[in-house]
């Protein structure tokens, strides 16, 4: 059957001290981007790839893959910006700080197809 789901543009942050805080809405919906989202040394939060919903018209067998664009939220002025394309679009994958960079491990290339790759990401 046809997938029924709604991707949201909402963005939220959580701290134990303050609970949930609503951030400015993203310019377009993104789900399943690498988590936790990488944060640069100057406080910019990055959403790298993920599912933008454009593949929902496809079956898992014909889906071309996930979004290769990235967004960033500049926490100094709380505005979203286009952060450009990424080399390896993925969704549903962990991301962690590693040796001064970020490691994005495995993830889905397209629905139902996992990647064995590990990517190292350097942020400005």
Model regions and ranges:
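Kelch-like beta-propeller repeat domains
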Residues: 1-124
């Amino acid at each position: 059957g046809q997938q029924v789901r709604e991707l949201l543009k909402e963005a939220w942050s959580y701290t134990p001290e303050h609970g949930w805080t609503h951030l400015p809405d993203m310019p377009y919906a993104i789900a399943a981007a690498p988590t936790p989202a990488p944060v640069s040394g100057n406080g910019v939060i990055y959403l790298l790839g993920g599912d933008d919903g454009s593949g929902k018209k496809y079956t898992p067998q014909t889906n071309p893959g996930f979004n290769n664009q990235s967004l960033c939220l500049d926490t100094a002025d709380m505005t979203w910006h286009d952060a450009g394309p990424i080399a390896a679009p993925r969704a549903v994958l962990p991301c962690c700080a590693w040796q001064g960079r970020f490691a994005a491990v495995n993830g889905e290339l397209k629905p139902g197809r996992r990647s064995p790759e590990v990517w190292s990401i350097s942020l400005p």
